[in-house]
Amino acid sequence: MRFIDQTEIFVKAGDGGDGMVAFRREKYVPAGGPAGGNGGRGGSVILQASTQLQTLLDFKYKHQFVAEDGKRGGPKNLTGASGQDRLIEVPCGTVIYDADSMTLLGDLTTNGQTLTVAQGGKGGLGNKHFLSNRNRAPEHALPGLPGEEFRLHLELKLLAEVGIIGLPNAGKSTLISVLSAARPKIADYPFTTLIPNLGVVPRATGDGTVFADIPGLIEGAHEGVGLGHDFLRHVERTRLLVHLVDATAEDPEQDYQTIQKELSAYGQGLQNRPQLLVLNKIDAMDSEQLLEKQACLEQMSGSPVYLISAVAQQGLDTLLQQVWEELDRLPNDLQEAPIPVLDSPILRET
């Protein structure tokens, strides 16, 4: 399945139904008063988060969404039927912006959460509302008001507790594949992974923790180099980062610093996100060189460095145990705070 994590759509709420001009014409009321009903309200356009969707791919092929118009008012003071709302399902983690101003409108993070993005137009008044002492038989009614319409920019930020980061070819995809049932594309060249991969890693408690393999970051990622903005966006919601460094690289310390600089330059507090620092591919190193690189990296980072080989599945139990301990220790609200919904009569949570 192709991964799409941002797109634009057009939404149009239904127009309100027109009010009606009608008069009472019962058998014993030959000259009855006005009895035209109001038009029905137009349907609204509502976004709803769903765990059944993992990508915005559906919106690649369908960009326009229109709700139903309200029906015209009827005789005998009958109000026209309201138009049916248009419900649009999006993946959990979708952030919604006004595409023209890039004003933040809302953030749908939980299954079933909704946001009304375009309100249906009000129905027009029937002629019964224009009865007065001076006009006992009004022959006019009001048309319904048009429904709102907007262009929306949708962005998907993955909801994963643990993000695996590192330079291209550090072994992130291999790690997530051996820890979970995820099967990302794996090859021995940089930038094999061009989309984030999600995997659920089981715990002894019976629970599962979602890991995200973030595609390789490079120098300049915070400025958008190498799709850096697209990749870093998915780190924002993680509670814990597993920073993978290739032990066979010429300068692991420099590789570590490169990623740290990009996290810091991107902002959003990513440089302060809790991390576990990991040297991967230890099966390809002799022990003396490995211990030297581990010591240098620990001295530079001020953190313990865990040794693993994702391919040979060495050191994974120790790493996972540390991941579980960190997650249990960290507060659940460490995940990025939900983006507030714009306080507007037009765009609001429902």
Swiss-Prot record:
<comment type="subunit">
    <text>Monomer.</text>
</comment>
<dbReference type="InterPro" id="IPR006074">
    <property type="entry name" value="GTP1-OBG_CS"/>
</dbReference>
<keyword id="KW-0460">Magnesium</keyword>
<feature type="binding site">
    <location>
        <begin position="213"/>
        <end position="216"/>
    </location>
    <ligand>
        <name>GTP</name>
    </ligand>
</feature>
<dbReference type="InterPro" id="IPR045086">
    <property type="entry name" value="OBG_GTPase"/>
</dbReference>
<dbReference type="Pfam" id="PF01018">
    <property type="entry name" value="GTP1_OBG"/>
</dbReference>
<feature type="binding site">
    <location>
        <position position="193"/>
    </location>
    <ligand>
        <name>Mg(2+)</name>
    </ligand>
</feature>
<dbReference type="InterPro" id="IPR031167">
    <property type="entry name" value="G_OBG"/>
</dbReference>
<feature type="domain" description="Obg">
    <location>
        <begin position="1"/>
        <end position="159"/>
    </location>
</feature>
<dbReference type="GO" id="GO:0000287">
    <property type="term" value="F:magnesium ion binding"/>
</dbReference>
<keyword id="KW-0479">Metal-binding</keyword>
<dbReference type="GO" id="GO:0042254">
    <property type="term" value="P:ribosome biogenesis"/>
</dbReference>
<feature type="binding site">
    <location>
        <begin position="191"/>
        <end position="195"/>
    </location>
    <ligand>
        <name>GTP</name>
    </ligand>
</feature>
<comment type="function">
    <text>An essential GTPase which binds GTP, GDP and possibly (p)ppGpp with moderate affinity, with high nucleotide exchange rates and a fairly low GTP hydrolysis rate. Plays a role in control of the cell cycle, stress response, ribosome biogenesis and in those bacteria that undergo differentiation, in morphogenesis control.</text>
</comment>
<dbReference type="InterPro" id="IPR006169">
    <property type="entry name" value="GTP1_OBG_dom"/>
</dbReference>
<dbReference type="InterPro" id="IPR027417">
    <property type="entry name" value="P-loop_NTPase"/>
</dbReference>
<dbReference type="InterPro" id="IPR014100">
    <property type="entry name" value="GTP-bd_Obg/CgtA"/>
</dbReference>
<dbReference type="Pfam" id="PF01926">
    <property type="entry name" value="MMR_HSR1"/>
</dbReference>
<keyword id="KW-0963">Cytoplasm</keyword>
<keyword id="KW-0547">Nucleotide-binding</keyword>
<keyword id="KW-0342">GTP-binding</keyword>
<dbReference type="GO" id="GO:0005525">
    <property type="term" value="F:GTP binding"/>
</dbReference>
<comment type="similarity">
    <text>Belongs to the TRAFAC class OBG-HflX-like GTPase superfamily. OBG GTPase family.</text>
</comment>
<feature type="binding site">
    <location>
        <begin position="280"/>
        <end position="283"/>
    </location>
    <ligand>
        <name>GTP</name>
    </ligand>
</feature>
<feature type="binding site">
    <location>
        <begin position="166"/>
        <end position="173"/>
    </location>
    <ligand>
        <name>GTP</name>
    </ligand>
</feature>
<dbReference type="InterPro" id="IPR006073">
    <property type="entry name" value="GTP-bd"/>
</dbReference>
<dbReference type="GO" id="GO:0005737">
    <property type="term" value="C:cytoplasm"/>
</dbReference>
<feature type="binding site">
    <location>
        <begin position="309"/>
        <end position="311"/>
    </location>
    <ligand>
        <name>GTP</name>
    </ligand>
</feature>
<feature type="binding site">
    <location>
        <position position="173"/>
    </location>
    <ligand>
        <name>Mg(2+)</name>
    </ligand>
</feature>
<dbReference type="InterPro" id="IPR036726">
    <property type="entry name" value="GTP1_OBG_dom_sf"/>
</dbReference>
<feature type="domain" description="OBG-type G">
    <location>
        <begin position="160"/>
        <end position="328"/>
    </location>
</feature>
<protein>
    <recommendedName>
        <fullName>GTPase Obg</fullName>
        <ecNumber>3.6.5.-</ecNumber>
    </recommendedName>
</protein>
<dbReference type="GO" id="GO:0003924">
    <property type="term" value="F:GTPase activity"/>
</dbReference>
<keyword id="KW-0378">Hydrolase</keyword>
<dbReference type="InterPro" id="IPR005225">
    <property type="entry name" value="Small_GTP-bd"/>
</dbReference>
